[in-house]
Amino acid sequence: MDLGPLQAGRLPERLFTKSKRIDAAPALVLRDLARLDQVEISPRDGELVLIGRRHQRDNNSWMHNTERLTRGKPRHQLLMHPDDLASRGITDGNRVTVRSRVGSVEVEVKAADDMMPGVVSLPHGYGHQVDGTGMSRAAKVPGVSINDLTDPERLDVSGNAALNGVPVEVTPAG
């Protein structure tokens, strides 16, 4: 569908701010910046920093409910640097317990040289084994929900879910 040439000057008529400009630093956000100084950014001894990740076929959780997108090598594992595995007596492919302040999950771990030491990564969109999800195909796909580890009370000036920077402990499962 061709909508014709772009027309300059249309944005201001579509903005509902008094100035007809995009406010990139609203007062509400600026007033909240002081809270950032209160955020603990360093993990404690023995803790690692959990970050999320996405895959082109795992971008959203509903994608696990279609067989075509769940084919191929498993992508649900916790990625962890080999040095962090060794220091905890964990072997690539073993099951581990990942514990945060608010919850814990058990998942398979995968050694990944491209992970920064001290950082672990769980993919977004897994963990449909819970009753009532209505995702029959996705319930058969292994993996855990990163939401079980993220802290709903975590300070975050953006107001978004804090899926990255979560302090966790990783130990052999069992």
Please provide the spans of the model-predicted regions.
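Long, contiguous, secondary-structure-rich segments that constitute the structural scaffold
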Residues: S61-L79, D83-G174
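Long, low-complexity segments enriched in small/aliphatic residues
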Residues: M1-R68
